[in-house]
Amino acid sequence: MRVAILESIIMPAGHEVEFDRMIINELKRQGHEPVLMVPENFTFKVDYGVDGIYLEGGEVVTYAGASKWKKPFLSLLRERRRRAWFTSAAKKLEEYNCDALIIPTSTYRYIKALLDTPLKNAKVPVHFIFHGIGKGENVRFLKQAERANRYPNIYLDVITLRDDMLSSDLPRVRPILPPVFIPSTGETPTFSTHTPLRLGFFGQFRKEKNIIPLLDAFKTAAFTGPVELLVQGATAKPEDGELFDAIAYEYKDVPGLSFLHANLIGSDWDKALLDVDAILMPYGAERYRYHWSAMLYTAIGFYKPALVSPEINPEVLRDYHVGESLDISSVNTIRAGLEQFVNKMIENPDIYEAGLVQANEDFGHKRMMDSIINV
């Protein structure tokens, strides 16, 4: 099949980019022909190795650098252009003989836009992928899903570990298991550990992501062997960058602790993750009970055990022995959980390997893609 992927998010790196790469590579592996549909003058930050089809309707609208006064105008402009892109996509699907369309990152607003355009009457399956439905989003989502239900080729595929937020009366609203993220090379990592044991904390650093309790817990923890912790932070705002550097300076003399203030992209991101033995995720928010955690599924795909807060996709640790849950209520509870997790890995390095192997099998890319395109 020729499968079009409509992408309107411009990102130099991150999970949106890796998700697109995942879809494209798996479609290729299965013998399909993926093509990208993008707005006019779209700047590709990654070479996906596929043809591009340019949509009419204007360029991508970005909020980057916009004042709070300008954002409402940009929001309206984005909605208008989204409808124009969908209208153009309806024509391009026929013009380029596409057999299906995938919109890889959607919200309920995408359904509203769809219903204002000819794309709702597409002659081929159109798949809107939702990366979870939050508790507060459910009513709005289901309202739009009910409106879209009359159009037989519109599929709303929700990546989730739970289906209690969906409705059995809507047969084309389908739960899809989350996929693991793997190295950009497509190679399957192997499980391994080092001495000293290497821990990693990765991702976007913001002021509200308080890492001080973790650092204090690591500083005072009693491990049964040598341990290192790398704290990587990518920062978007100057004040976040200044805070990260100040924290790194304050803790620079802690044995085994190192900091990396950098935005890791592509092979640099892969290497940093592959170099550690386990990943720490001592942060939580209620939304992670409804939205899948891309960082957790990165840890699984890279065969790294994870120490996570209880809110982060609790179904994963319930069903797979890929790490431990961490009480983040105080430095003392973090220290106790960190010691237990690390000492288990030091004393029994293979303790999580079987769980990681099983999770990678169940959350593989083939299963996700089959769930989407087999209608």
Predicted regions and their residues:
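Glycosyltransferase donor-sugar binding loop
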Residues: 228-244, 262
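A charged, aromatic-enriched C-terminal amphipathic alpha-helix characteristic of glycosyltransferases
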Residues: 14-15, 328-336, 343-375
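A short, active-site helix/loop in glycosyltransferases that binds the activated sugar's phosphate group
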Residues: 134-175
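Nucleotide-activated donor-dependent transferases that construct or modify glycoconjugates
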Residues: 1-14, 201, 280
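A short, glycine/small-residue-rich beta-strand->loop->alpha-helix junction that serves as a flexible
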Residues: 7-22, 44, 206-209
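Conserved donor-binding/catalytic core segment of Leloir-type glycosyltransferases
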Residues: 190-209, 215-219, 229-230
